[in-house]
Amino acid sequence: MLFDQIASNKRKTWILLLVFFLLLALVGYAVGYLFIRSGLGGLVIALIIGFIYALSMIFQSTEIVMSMNGAREVDEQTAPDLYHVVEDMALVAQIPMPRVFIIDDPALNAFATGSNPQNAAVAATSGLLAIMNREELEAVMGHEVSHIRNYDIRISTIAVALVSAITMLSGMAGRMMWWGGAGRRRSDDDRDGNGLEIIMLVVSLLAIVLAPLAATLVQLAISRQREFLADASSVELTRNPQGMINALDKLDNSKPMSRHVDDASSALYINDPKKGGGFQKLFYTHPPISERIERLKQM
C-alpha cells in the first residue's frame, strides 16, 4: 500500500509538471502576443522562468519556503519537546531526521517541505506547541513526517514553484496592461484587423486572467487527497487514532494565521491557514476537518 502510494506520487509529479508547464506556456504565449508581438517568444521566456523556479525550489526548497513563511530553525536545545517528537516520528517512519522550524504565530498549524526525505524539514507554529499535548503533537508531526515519507513534499514543492511563476507572470502582464502597454499597441493593430486578431486578443486576455486560477485548482485537487492519506499514515505511525482525532478537533477550532500566507504556500499546511467563508470555501486547500475526523473514526 505504502510503496504503491509512493510510486503513484512519483507518477503524479510528472503529470503535475506537465499540467503546470502547459499553463505556464499558455500564459507566456499570451504575454508575448500582447506585449512583444511574438507569442512563441513569450512562451520560451515563460518556460525558462518556470524551469528556473522549479529547479531553485527543488534544490533550495527548505530555505525558500521557510523564509516565505517566516519560520526560524530550532534544535534539541532550543525546542526539545518538538525536536524529540519529530525525532521519534522520523525513527518510526524510517526516514532521516528532518530539520525543525517554528513559526511565531498563535494559530495552530504545521507543514513539511523539501524535495525528498534526505532534504526535508517540518515547521510548527508556536500556537500549536502551546495548545497541543504530547499525543496530539505526535499525531500532527506524524502527519507531516508521513508527507515526507510518501514523497508528498516533492509534489507540493514543485506546485508552489510553478503556481508562483504563473501568478508572477500574470500579475506582471496585468500591471503592464494597467499602464496601457498592450492596449495602445494592440488597439492600433486590431482597429483595422481581421476577426482572428480580435479572437487572439480575447483568448490572450482570458489566459492571463484564468491561468493562475486554473493552476491553483490543480494544486488544490492534489492537496486535498493527500491530506486523507497523511492522516491515516500518522495513525499508522503513532498507533493512536484518538490522538489524531483530538488534534484535528483542536485544529478545526483554531483561528486563521495572523501572518499573511500566500496562496501557493497554503496547500502545504495541515490546517487551512486562511479559513475564509462563503465563496472562498471553493478554494480551500484542504478537505473539511469534520470529514477527515469521520474517516479516522471508520478505521
Curated annotation (Swiss-Prot):
The chain crosses the membrane at residues 15-35, 39-59, 158-178, 198-218. Keywords: Cell membrane, Hydrolase, Membrane, Metal-binding, Metalloprotease, Protease, Transmembrane, Transmembrane helix, Zinc. Its EC number is 3.4.24.-. It comes from the Bacteria. GO terms for cellular component: plasma membrane. It is found in: Cell membrane. Zn(2+) binds at H143, H147, E227. It is a multi-pass membrane protein. The active site is at E144. Its cofactor is Zn(2+). Binds 1 zinc ion per subunit. Pfam families: Peptidase_M48. One of its GO terms (biological process) is proteolysis. The keyword Transferase does not apply. GO terms for molecular function: metalloendopeptidase activity; zinc ion binding. Belongs to the peptidase M48B family. PANTHER family: PROTEASE HTPX (PTHR43221:SF1). This is Protease HtpX homolog. It comes from Streptococcus pneumoniae serotype 2 (strain D39 / NCTC 7466).
